[in-house]
Amino acid sequence: VAKSSVGLEVGSSTVRLATVSRSRSGSVIEHLNSIGLNPGVVVDGEVVDAEALSGAIRHLVKVGKPGGKDVRLGVASQRMVARQVDLPWVPPKEFKQALPLLAADMLPMPVQDCVLDFLSYEDLVDDDGAHVIRGLLVAANEQSVLDTVDAVESAGLRVVSVTLTPLSTLGALADPLSPNPEALLDIGHTMTSISIHEGGQPRFVRILSRGGQDITAKLAEHLSIDEEDAERWKLSLPVTWPTMNAADQSATETAMRTALADLVSDIRTSIDFYATSEGRRPGRAYVVGGAGATLGLLPILASVLRIPVAVGTPHVTRHGKSMSADELAMAGSPASASAVGLALGAA
């Protein structure tokens, strides 16, 4: 009998809901839906208007037909950090209790205000001969997480787990057999996360305060139009591009390169930092997120990063028979990866 799980991604402009069923024959995406949020409901990953968010989620549940009330929640904000650290070895039974003390000096915020997790992937002996555990330390502001959980549960759902969204997405897309590190670029409305894994293990996560909204603002400035018109123009490009003459295409390329320059530069800086500190570069990158389909983004990233860059799609490739045309279209877009990854519980 197939078992289903539900992933819920709360972004700054959109909430996405995915139901994935699993059986011996594999995983199947059964339903995939989203709803837009009004500006100011969620700002940079922080819930500002809990009532409006709950209302949007209730409406999404009505149309999204999730496979149950239990959801795996994905969150990301500027008040969350994830970094590779070496911690002193502690017996496994004592580790959870000891983690706040071990991590206190490694965080940019008070440890007592945080929810902590540690993804260990290597036991080793350091240069001083001490036994240490290497892994990814994840910290999130506790009140920020609770605000999101409360809004979700006020909509009639039960949150069974909370995951830093980039980690669940990475788990759904990463190739554990890749001989080289891989980068996942999740480009949202106001934030972009950069995650790098090696052999399926997350080694690096950085959250940037730039996203699709910044691309639109740069376009508006370059084209001397307001941001609403710039957003409409940006979204129409996949349709209008093939009909443009050579001069218009050249002007469009210039506009997009200008609009993408700051975001692409920040992404390159983050990947260069990883390459310098670890002594190896990612062999390829995948792009997901609501702004991941921006025209020109992939070739510009590939040129600047000097590695292959492709749209990221979850390992689940089978779609349920009851999926609508809109759901199938969403399943093929880079925006779907996070919600599906959460439903898979891959983090």
Regions found by a protein language model. Give the residues of each.
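Phosphate/pyrophosphate-binding loops at sites that engage ATP/ADP/AMP, CoA/4′-phosphopantetheine
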Residues: 57-69, 155, 225, 268-284
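Glycine-rich phosphate-binding loops at beta-strand->alpha-helix junctions
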Residues: 259, 280-310, 314-316
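A short acidic Gly-Thr/Ser loop motif
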Residues: 2, 8-15, 76-78, 184-192, ...
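Adenine-nucleotide phosphate-binding core of ATP-dependent small-molecule kinases
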Residues: 232-284, 291, 338
